[in-house]
UniProtKB/Swiss-Prot annotation:
Keywords: Ribonucleoprotein, Ribosomal protein, RNA-binding, rRNA-binding. The gene is rpsK. HAMAP family: Ribosomal_uS11 (MF_01310). This is Small ribosomal subunit protein uS11. Located on the platform of the 30S subunit, it bridges several disparate RNA helices of the 16S rRNA. Forms part of the Shine-Dalgarno cleft in the 70S ribosome. GO terms for cellular component: ribonucleoprotein complex; ribosome. Belongs to the universal ribosomal protein uS11 family. The keyword Ligase does not apply. One of its GO terms (biological process) is translation. It comes from Rickettsia massiliae (strain Mtu5). Transmembrane segments: none annotated.
């Protein structure tokens, strides 16, 4: 008789409270779902979802990115989130609206955009 090996499916741990980090730059949108300690649950970016070039920085691309990342996070049982949003991009509002449409309980919204205190010199003016 042959020895049969039994494959045991690895059980995903359930996480009920998490943090959503949204980075909306001028060129892309990156969304990361983490637990309270900062361990990554799921992440997605507009470039990774098939958007290329200038379409990565659109509000629609941010909405699709939130949808993909939240589907993966819901597999872990995530229900309550805290939102940390940063960056100067125009897709910040649509990313937040997409999160509200995912039926999460939102406890707080924090803007973590870095503000330069006269740091680096800006690029030269564009002449057309």
């Amino acid at each position: 008789m042959m020895n049969q090996t039994v494959k045991v499916k690895k059980k995903k741990k359930t996480i009920t409270l998490g943090v959503v980090h949204i980075r909306a730059s001028f060129n892309n949108t990156i969304v990361t779902f983490t637990d309270i300690q900062g361990n990554t649950i799921s992440s997605a970016s507009a470039g990774g979802n098939g958007f290329k070039g200038a379409r990565k920085a659109t509000p629609y691309a941010a909405q699709v990115t939130i949808d993909r990342a939240s589907e993966k996070a819901k597999e872990y049982g995530l229900k309550t989130i805290s939102i940390r949003i940063g960056g100067p991009g125009a897709q910040r509002e649509s990313a937040m609206r997409a999160l509200f449409g995912q039926n999460f309980v939102v406890t707080s919204i924090v803007d973590v955009s870095s503000i330069a205190h006269n740091g680096v010199r800006p690029p030269k003016r564009r002449r057309v």
